[in-house]
């Protein structure tokens, strides 16, 4: 079977769905969207109910469930690396935190030759274009975009307010919008949830607009085997359908757009003969183009939890008990309200741990229950926790193809905690979190420290706790980076260096990981590049003001030292 389209998009994740929707707005353009996973079943509470966010991570239907190689600085642990599978990609299984990154992340990108139009003020119009915020638009937020964003409301859990107040009492700024004028500080955290209380994945927000268009063809359970080339030009894709072994072929008249994410995009390029020559040679893959940066520069956010018992019965611990869940589920299903309609990450913050950092290097998510991210090992009492992680680790990893078999996972190594700066940031972060948690605002609630525990104090004790307990925040990125240096894979429009008719558009093309969760920024990048592909003028630059700390101290005097 062979078909021909103008564009073939490989991967229906956050970026691929944006491109499929925007490109098919032009009625004379035909698009094939290939997705290795299945549909985003709207009746499956595991992906549709925000509070059920732990469930998709536990199975394989919606999760590629990659594992790292033994991480040498983490006691050789093989660490989890979940990625979304199905229409929506990782937006179908993520934590739904709507965080864009810091303005200075993008200004930093724009200092690289060829990336000058990636400054914050160039990107902000595309963040706004993608968003509908429930309380309306302003200079920073959109009012009519495909991504539904819900803000925390009065009357939510008192622990959220107490944790924000504790951050302010510890001497840090208060901010009313982590995506607005000032990211630095503590405040409410927005989430990608619809007004009806459903997960706002990109299958819902974007693809629902485009599914009925005659110029869009969506094929699920389609695992791309390799990109087809004529010389240096991408001309199509060979893919497997379901469990079959007979490849189908589709041809692209204009471009092949790789949107498979930071793990699978470099894997697919390498399998197709675009990557480091020595690696291709070792696997007997005919080299189409020697591009050493494919799979290099891999970055992620690492985080850990500090957990406390709660002296008052105000945590959502009862909601983890099966006998309370039918009522929560019914309220969510029929009314779109209640505990089920929230991801429970309704407060957070960003701080600088030392003067050397020009913008925040630590992120907090606050959660009014003590439990693991994937729903396991819940503490059997009322509790709460702070997720704390460093934002711009100097550690760099890599993705290496292990086999020409498209169903075999690649070798993944993040090299977590391979720099002294990593250890300094995490030790500082744990100690500062304890100071925050010890402020008067939490006195009515704070019981004993459950984790790490009061006996974990010295550098050596903290380091061993980090080695054993730090986990991924599920933010792999930067493995096909934008730029013009020898290790760059794509230019500022996502076009693969040295190739024709081939782009990569997803979190893998970030040159440097951002300060915060990745989904909102991945959507923004796809919106921006979609205009380029369509030959449209970029949206006018924003003139919004944004905070630069400059000489401001990292914190003021705490209420309780």
From Swiss-Prot:
It holds the Pfam family GMC_oxred_N. Its cofactor is FAD. FAD binds at residues 6-35. One of its GO terms (molecular function) is betaine-aldehyde dehydrogenase (NAD+) activity. Pathway: Amine and polyamine biosynthesis; betaine biosynthesis via choline pathway; betaine aldehyde from choline (cytochrome c reductase route): step 1/1. It catalyses: choline + A = betaine aldehyde + AH2; betaine aldehyde + NAD(+) + H2O = glycine betaine + NADH + 2 H(+). This is Oxygen-dependent choline dehydrogenase.
């Amino acid at each position: 079977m062979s078909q021909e389209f103008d564009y073939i998009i490989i991967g229906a994740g956050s970026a691929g769905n944006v491109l499929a929707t925007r490109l098919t707005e032009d009625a004379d353009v035909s698009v094939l969207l290939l997705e290795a996973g299945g549909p985003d079943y709207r009746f499956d509470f595991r992906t549709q109910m925000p509070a059920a966010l732990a469930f998709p991570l536990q199975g394989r239907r919606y999760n590629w469930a990659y594992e790292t190689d033994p991480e040498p600085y983490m006691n050789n642990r093989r660490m989890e690396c979940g990625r979304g599978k199905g229409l929506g990609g990782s937006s179908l299984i993520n934590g739904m935190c709507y965080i864009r990154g810091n303005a200075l992340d993008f200004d930093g990108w724009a200092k690289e030759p060829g990336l000058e139009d990636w400054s914050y003020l160039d990107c902000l119009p595309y963040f706004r274009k993608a968003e509908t915020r429930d309380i309306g638009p302003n200079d920073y937020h959109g009012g009519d975009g495909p991504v539904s964003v819900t803000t925390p409301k009065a009357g939510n859990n008192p622990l959220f307010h107490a944790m924000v107040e504790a951050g302010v009492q510890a001497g840090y700024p208060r901010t009313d919008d982590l995506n607005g004028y000032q990211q630095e500080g503590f405040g409410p955290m927005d989430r990608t949830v619809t007004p009806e209380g459903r997960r706002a994945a990109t299958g819902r927000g974007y693809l629902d607009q485009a599914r009925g268009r005659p110029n869009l063809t969506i094929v699920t359970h389609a695992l791309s085997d390799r990109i087809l080339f004529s010389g240096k030009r991408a001309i199509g894709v060979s893919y497997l359908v379901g469990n079959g072994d007979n490849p189908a072929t589709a041809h692209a008249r204009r471009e092949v757009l790789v949107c498979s994410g930071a793990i699978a995009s470099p894997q697919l390029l390498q399998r197709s003969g675009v990557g480091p020559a020595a690696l291709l040679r070792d696997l007997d893959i005919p080299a189409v183009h020697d591009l050493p940066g494919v799979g290099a520069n891999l970055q992620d956010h690492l985080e850990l939890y500090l957990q406390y018992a709660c002296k008052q019965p105000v945590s959502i611990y009862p909601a983890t008990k099966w006998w309370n869940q039918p009522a929560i589920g019914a309220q969510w299903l029929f009314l779109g309200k209640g505990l089920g309609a929230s991801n429970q990450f309704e407060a957070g913050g960003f701080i600088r741990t030392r003067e050397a950092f020009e913008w925040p290097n630590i992120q907090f998510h606050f959660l009014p229950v003590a439990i693991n991210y994937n729903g396991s090992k819940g503490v059997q009492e009322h509790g709460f926790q702070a997720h704390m992680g460093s934002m711009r680790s100097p550690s760099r990893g890599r993705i290496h193809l292990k086999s020409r078999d498209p169903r075999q996972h690649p070798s993944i190594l993040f090299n977590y905690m391979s720099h002294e700066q990593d250890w300094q940031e995490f030790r500082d972060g744990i100690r500062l979190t304890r100071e925050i948690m010890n402020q008067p605002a939490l006195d009515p609630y704070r019981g004993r420290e459950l984790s790490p525990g009061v006996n974990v104090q010295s550098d050596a004790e903290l380091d061993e706790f980090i080695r054993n307990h730090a986990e991924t925040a599920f933010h792999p990125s930067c493995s096909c980076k934008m730029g013009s240096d020898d290790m760059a894979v794509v230019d500022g429009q996502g076009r693969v260096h040295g190739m024709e008719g081939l782009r990569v558009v997803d979190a893998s093309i970030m040159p440097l990981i951002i300060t915060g969760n990745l989904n909102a920024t991945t959507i923004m990048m796809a919106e921006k590049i979609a205009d380029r592909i369509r030959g449209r003028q970029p949206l006018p630059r924003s003139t919004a003001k944004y905070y630069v700390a400059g000489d401001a101290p990292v914190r003021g005097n705490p209420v309780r030292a």
